[in-house]
Amino acid sequence: MGSNIVIYFSIIVIVTLNVNGVPASDLFKSVSQYHIPRSKVINKETVTKPLQFQRAICRLLQKLGEETFARLSQSELEAKQLDLIKTCYQANSFGDNENQGHMQRMDRNYYGWMDFGKRAIEDVDYEY
């Protein structure tokens, strides 16, 4: 019961507040920009099934990485990747120490962006 409350609270925070400096409204603007229907990211089903919502956020971040970050310099790329990696893992983390520790390890052991969305989705699937 307690974990359900934390999960739904996480969804509300993602939808209404800034997540690691990336406003949720910017994520949804990007959904329109890349012609991904808003309903694919959040709808009645994803609100009642938090795992699907988290996976949709990871897919969106992967799409943004593929199309946007290709035009950035290497230093800009690394800074933005790290921010969005944190955002994605916050979307998947419900505050337990294991997830937070994994996010910190990712900070230190950065791996290529193009593969990140796929790995993040696999990590979420594995945890559940």
Curated annotation (Swiss-Prot):
Record's GO cellular component terms: extracellular region
GO biological process, one term: neuropeptide signaling pathway
Residues where Phenylalanine amide is found: F116
Expression (tissue specificity): Expressed in both the gut and the neural ganglion.
Signal peptide: 1-22
Location of the protein in the cell: Secreted
One GO MF term attached to the UniProt entry: hormone activity
Keywords from the UniProt entry: Amidation, Cleavage on pair of basic residues, Hormone, Neuropeptide, Secreted, Signal, Sulfation
PROSITE patterns named among the record's database cross-references: GASTRIN
Modified residues (Sulfotyrosine): Y110, Y111
Residues excised as propeptide: 23-108, 120-128
Disulfide topology: none
Family the entry assigns: Belongs to the gastrin/cholecystokinin family.
Protein name: Cionin
